[in-house]
Each structure stands twice: as structure tokens, then as C-alpha cells.
Amino acid sequence: MASATASISSHSVALRDLKAARIGAVKQQVAAAPAAGTAAARAQRARAVRPLRAAEPARQPVSASAAAAPAAAPVAEDAAAAAVDAPAPAVDYEALAQELQGASPLEIMDRALAMFGSDIAIAFSGAEDVALIEYAKLTGRPFRVFSLDTGRLNPETYQLFDKVEKHYGIRIEYMFPDAGEVQALVRAKGLFSFYEDGHQECCRARKVRPLRRALRGLRAWITGQRKDQSPGTRAAIPVVQVDPSFEGLAGGAGSLVKWNPVANVDGKDVWTFLRAMDVPVNALHAQGYVSIGCEPCTRPVLPGQHEREGRWWWEDAKAKECGLHKGNIDDQGGAAAAAAHKAGGANGNGSAGAPDIFESSGVVSLTRAGVENLLRLESRAEPWLVVLYAPWCPFCQAMEASYLELAERLGGAGGGVKVGKFRADGEQKAFAQQELQLQSFPTILLFPSRTARPIKYPSEKRDVDSLLAFVNSLR
């Protein structure tokens, strides 16, 4: 797909000309229009803007001028009423996604706004998704923007909200969490419980439920999801889809459409577009932040790190979704494996029937006594690299091939590093959490030859080259 910047100028010029033509046509129609009758009043009600917060649309009252206007002919009235009340033709959104697969973000945005009018809104998080607002402006169509204020955003994010409103002349429709629910959570578990038992509970209260309320007042929404944001969980995002997780205005499954105009755009191209259009951006980006969320759960990333490594860094890669886009998660391990991973093998050994992994002559299977011995030594004959794993964990299974290849390279001539594994689920989990820095599976530790305390591998990149660079920098 061509980058966002490659197509922006031609589309923006064309759409501005189109907008001018539309305005002229509308003025002529208004001047020639007869007085509105009952049918026009019905059409007005059908087009009424639905409030974002409401579960059901609010009916706009008929204006005094419309009420006083003479009634139209019965035949014309019946025809107009039938046109207003007739159900919209069904849309095959899978086919539409294929049709728009090669379209630019501007074209996709224009199609979305044209199809849904005031019943669609842009979800704005205060990060680089400001590009969505710029694309919407360039279409020349009216648009709405909403945002989730969790109460724990960075000051820079709130400052960006204000700048965006002034820059585009809009009012962002803010959604807030239920005060009673947040109060109960904080009183029961404290302000930072997500560091201990995961972020999902906090995100449900502060983000997911407010989003659900917002979407019940819409027929469609627009997100800034990109495939390259999280290749492990967002690789299959289409540009448009029936929302698999949330309900819209009509209620029930299939009542909400989700648009992802930048799904196929590379993050670098998004930033090229933002700089070219000179739009306001979050000041945190200049401080090394890429993916931006709540202040306690967001941090800068280093050069070479993936942007999602700055979010919920204490959890595994596939746990790094707050729930807003859970329907797009590519769950390669299956729901059962994900549930077992979250439980951490609390029941016995997690999945007792799972075959063992990391089996190779180059990988030493350590017992608890062996690990305790490694911990006691202040000086070792050679470094040790040890993976703490659970055989049922899909993330452990996914790194098996790279770990075995690493063992061959480190154990060969000139390698000089012992490679081991320690099964840390079940009855060994408490020990691993207390003594071995275990928070999630897999955890990789390097025991240097001249340092007593093991060093935990900080990244989620578990390919051979990344692991080898970690070992060589500390051995």
C-alpha cells in the first residue's frame, strides 16, 4: 500500500473542490425548497444527531416552522415516510474490506463518514491517532471525536486534547469511568493493583465500560489501530469490519461497524504525514514515548525496542491489550491456553498433560536444588542462561525453536555459556516469584560468572539475535 503521504495532497485538493461544489449545490436546493411538511419533519427526526452517551437516540422535536407548514399531498407524504422508514440495504463488510484494502487512509475515512454521517465518531487517545482527525478534516465532511478520560492520563495528554480542540475548532466528547466502580476498586486493592495482578481489571473499569457506553450511541466508530503496532496481536486487522466485541445503537451482535483507516500504514509513514501537515502532537513523543496510555502504565522505549514495550512492560506481549480491541487479538494459543497463562498454573502444574519443551542435549534441565545452588554462588566457572517456563504456556512454546538454536550457538566452540531451563509453574511458582523475579512466562535469566544476582532479560523479542546480544553484552 502506498504510504499516507504519497496520496495526501491529491486527495485533499480533490476533496476540497468537492466540498465547495457540495456547498453550492446545497445553497441552491435550500433556496428552491418548498415549505417542509410532515414528511420533511419525519426525515428531520431520522437524521437527528444521537448523543454519544445515550443507549437510545434522543428524538429531536419538530420545529415550530415545520409544524405550522401546510401538509403535503398524502401520496407524497406516504412515499417520503416509506423512504425514511425503509431499512438500509445490508452491507457485506468483508467484501468492502477487500475493496478498500489498497485504498489510502483518506479514501477510507471519506467512505466511513459518507456512510454513517453523525452516527460515527473517531476514538482519540491523545497519541499519534491525531492523524485520524486530520484525515477527517481533509474530507470536508462533518465529524465527531470522542476520548476516554481514565483520570490517570499524563498532563501532556490533557494539554494535547486542548490543542486539538482549538486547532480543529471541535469539541471532543469525553467519556469518564463510573466513580463508584473506581472507588470500590481502589479501596479494595489500592492505587497500583495492576502491578500485582495485571492491568485488565483496572482497564475494564476505566476504559472498557466507558467505551461500551459511548458505542451504544453510535452505529460505527473509527480507530487508529495499525497492524505494525503489535504484530503478535494486531496482525489481522481489516480496514473495516463488523465489530466483534461491542454493540451499537440498534443493540445486539452486528449492530456496530469498526473502521481502521490506518490498519495497513507503517508507523513511520504516519509520522511523516503528521510532520507534513504540521498538526499538534503529544509532547511525550519527544521524550521517547511511542505508544501512550495511562501514566502509571506507559514509559519511554529505547531505540530498537518495539513501541508496545512501553506499555504494561511487566506483562507478556499478548497480554498487552486493554480490552478496547480484544476482538482483533490473534489468539494463536487459544482461549484455554491464555486462561492458563493468566492463572500461572495455580492449579497444580497448570496443564499436567502438556508435553515438556526445550528438550535438547544442549539445554540442561535444572531442579530446584540446582537453581538454588546457582543463586548461592558469587562466582561461577562460566555464565548460565536459564529460562523459567511452563510447558503449557503458548509464549514458551513459541520461543522453543529460537532458544534451542541459541543453545547450540552458545554451547559450541567459543560459546562458553551454559544454557538451562527450570519449570517454574505449579508448586515451584511461589519460589520462582520470590527468588527468581518471575512475573510471567517465559522469564529468561542470565547468571553472570562474576555477579551473584541473576539479570532478567527485559525485552519481549525472543529471537536468537536479540537473546544473543543480551548475553554477549553481560557475560
Swiss-Prot record:
Keyword line: 4Fe-4S, Amino-acid biosynthesis, Chloroplast, Cysteine biosynthesis, Disulfide bond, Iron, Iron-sulfur, Metal-binding, Oxidoreductase, Plastid, Redox-active center, Stress response, Transit peptide
Give the cofactor note text: Binds 1 [4Fe-4S] cluster.
**Thioredoxin domain segment(s):** 341-475
Cysteine pairs forming cystine bridges in this chain are C393-C396
> Annotated Gene Ontology MF terms?
4 iron, 4 sulfur cluster binding; adenylyl-sulfate reductase (glutathione) activity; metal ion binding; phosphoadenylyl-sulfate reductase (thioredoxin) activity
| Subcellular location(s) per record | Plastid, Chloroplast
Transit peptide per record: 1-63
Described function: Reduces sulfate for Cys biosynthesis.
Q: List, alphabetically, the CDD domains matched.
A: PAPS_reductase (cd23945)
Protein name as annotated: Probable 5'-adenylylsulfate reductase 1, chloroplastic
The encoding gene: APR1
Q: Give the species this sequence originates from.
A: Oryza sativa subsp. japonica
